[in-house]
């Protein structure tokens, strides 16, 4: 009775109507962004000759649990270089349902998740993975000083298959701090696509600094190219939205990827205005048995 009376008030009806309008507008904008992203990818495939090169990774992008098509590119990298222990490590896993390794977990891989925000733990609880050895986790803020210690304490193998770093501000410094302590076969790194491909640039290091929402973050693709070369890795591609770069350890590159392995050759500009979940709402996928 009181509820019906409450909702009959003109001001409440107007608020409900406005909320419904806002929800419809948000849905329309999201759908429009998703359509734009699809059209962009289709347009690039038909107009950019790089997509015709089978050694490039751009044409293999698809989105299962990732944000920018990383799932497909990662699958293609390991189709070319093979897998060994099927172990991943990712820093910056977000909410636990949309990141670079959630899809691998559903395909039978095991690994390690670390993030400063504990929200991803809720997803692990829902999926029954909190006590599982398949996915170990830690809530921690990664920096240059603690990265090696955290990976060592978690028991991450030195030669895991995949390392993914997406910690916004200090990613360049953290990858550099790993040195020879860990030698993943492939690496996914967030880069700053606002900086042109030929310019070497990175933010000043401060362990307590966090991303302020501007384009003053991380490092340019050229800076990562040079860091990767120093660590023994080759830049083999970027995702179409200019968010992540992909590196493969030099001893595994062979003739599998498009040379030269430079930022000028593989750079994609930031297209963040087109990043949107394509399709149904995201969720952790059921885990398949390892073949």
What would you call each of these model-derived segments?
Residues 58-153, 157-165, 193-196:
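SAM cofactor-binding core of SAM-dependent methyltransferases
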Residues 134-136, 173-210:
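A short alpha/beta connector and helix-capping loop motif
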Residues 90, 113, 164, 186-190, ...:
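A structural signal for short, well-ordered beta-strand segments and their strand-loop junctions
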Residues 164-174:
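Active-site glycine- and acidic-residue-rich loops that bind
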Residues 1-24:
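Acidic, low-complexity intrinsically disordered segments
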Residues 27-82, 89, 97, 103, ...:
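Rossmann-like AdoMet/SAM-dependent catalytic core
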Residues 124, 151, 174-178, 247:
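Hydrophobic packing residues within well-ordered alpha-helices of enzyme cores
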């Amino acid at each position: 009775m009181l509820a019906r009376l409450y909702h009959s008030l003109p001001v409440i009806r107007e608020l409900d109507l406005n909320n419904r309008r806002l929800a419809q507008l948000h849905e329309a904008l999201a759908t429009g962004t998703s359509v734009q992203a699809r059209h962009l990818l289709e347009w690039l495939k038909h107009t950019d000759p790089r997509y015709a090169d089978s050694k490039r990774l751009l044409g293999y992008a698809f989105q299962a649990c990732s944000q920018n098509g990383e799932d497909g590119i990662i699958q293609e990298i390991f189709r070319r270089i093979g897998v060994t222990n099927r172990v991943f490590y990712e820093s910056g896993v977000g909410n636990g349902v949309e990141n670079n390794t959630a899809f691998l977990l559903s395909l039978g891989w095991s690994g390690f998740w670390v993030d400063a925000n504990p929200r991803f733990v809720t997803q692990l609880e829902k999926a029954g993975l909190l006590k599982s050895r398949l996915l170990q986790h830690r809530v921690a803020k990664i920096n240059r000083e603690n990265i090696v210690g955290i990976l060592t304490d978690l028991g991450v193998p030195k030669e895991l298959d995949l390392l993914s770093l997406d910690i916004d501000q200090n990613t360049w410094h953290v990858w550099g701090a790993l040195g020879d302590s860990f030698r993943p076969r492939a690496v996914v790194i967030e880069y700053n696509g606002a900086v042109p491909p030929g310019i070497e640039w990175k933010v000043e290091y401060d362990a307590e600094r966090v991303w302020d929402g501007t384009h003053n973050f991380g490092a340019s693709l050229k800076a990562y190219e040079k860091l990767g070369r120093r660590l023994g890795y080759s830049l083999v591609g970027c995702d179409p939205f200019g968010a992540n770069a992909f590196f493969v350890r030099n001893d595994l590159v062979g003739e599998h990827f498009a040379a030269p392995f430079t930022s000028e050759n593989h750079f994609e500009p930031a297209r963040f205005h087109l990043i949107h979940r394509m399709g149904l709402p995201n969720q952790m996928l059921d885990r398949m048995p390892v073949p």
